[in-house]
Amino acid sequence: MPIIIDKDLPARKVLQEENIFVMTKERAETQDIRALKIAILNLMPTKQETEAQLLRLIGNTPLQLDVHLLHMESHLSRNVAQEHLTSFYKTFRDIENEKFDGLIITGAPVETLSFEEVDYWEELKRIMEYSKTNVTSTLHICWGAQAGLYHHYGVQKYPLKEKMFGVFEHEVREQHVKLLQGFDELFFAPHSRHTEVRESDIRGVKELTLLANSEEAGVHLVIGPEGRQVFALGHSEYSCDTLKQEYERDRQKGLNIDVPKNYFKHNNPNEKPLVRWRSHGNLLFSNWLNYYVYQETPYVL
């Protein structure tokens, strides 16, 4: 089933070329069906790339989704045209009196700062509080997951000696949780971060359940009570070449960055990346949408 997005959103062309089913709002309004209202709080500077990554995954389900893109009013985005934000994005003030079936909070390149040093932290806290009573389920990704774990449960993040960068094998730790329905016992997911949350801290919070982790990359998937909050420390939404672009960007900046682990064939950056996370990335998002959003949300929000 399709996702409903603005007909002029640049990501629309990318998705259509990949045979992702998209629909205009005008067409959707003629169908006698309630689409799920999904908000994406896009904290990434690469807004259009992140839009395509997430829409690609949530569009690959049998559900009709009405997608609302959000940006932070208290932060000036320097890497995206203001015209793009004005045309396709809303702020929290625009939607704070509405309810949503699902909310996705993305990562952000601010993890070396303390949470309180982030210029939009107060606004983000208001959004996370809002989500507790106005959203059926919220999926937090990477720094967004760290922020959610810290705000809701007091879980700290810790700096890493070296950037966790690459594609890592993870093990399922809970066998009978719907979020992991259809998962293999071992699966891969990309990580790209300078900080971590620790398994001992997660296990120390009785409301949280550790679902999957990696011997090398640490905590990946965590879930809160009744699936109202889901936390993914990795980047299952990443495109094939996202880590490659990050690696080349940092090299061009003169940063001392290692080749992303387990990513390029033969670990050679001159060869093609090996994509080993796509199927489980699709499964993660479809399970979240089906079991924790669609199956749980009321017909009338």
Curated annotation (Swiss-Prot):
The active site is at 142 (acyl-thioester intermediate), 235 (proton acceptor), 237. It comes from the Bacteria. It catalyses: L-homoserine + acetyl-CoA = O-acetyl-L-homoserine + CoA. Its main location: cytoplasm. Keywords: Acyltransferase, Amino-acid biosynthesis, Cytoplasm, Methionine biosynthesis, Transferase. GO terms for molecular function: homoserine O-acetyltransferase activity; homoserine O-succinyltransferase activity. It is an enzyme of class 2 (transferase). It is found in: Cytoplasm. Pfam families: HTS. InterPro entries: Class_I_gatase-like, HST_MetA, MetA_family. Substrate binds at residues 163, 192, 249. One of its GO terms (biological process) is L-methionine biosynthetic process from homoserine via O-succinyl-L-homoserine and cystathionine. Pathway: Amino-acid biosynthesis; L-methionine biosynthesis via de novo pathway; O-acetyl-L-homoserine from L-homoserine: step 1/1. GO terms for cellular component: cytoplasm. The record marks 111 as: Important for acyl-CoA specificity. NCBIfam families: metA (TIGR01001). HAMAP family: MetA_acyltransf. Belongs to the MetA family. This is Homoserine O-acetyltransferase. It comes from Bacillus thuringiensis subsp. konkukian (strain 97-27). The lineage of its organism: Bacteria, Bacillati, Bacillota, Bacilli, Bacillales. The gene is metAA.
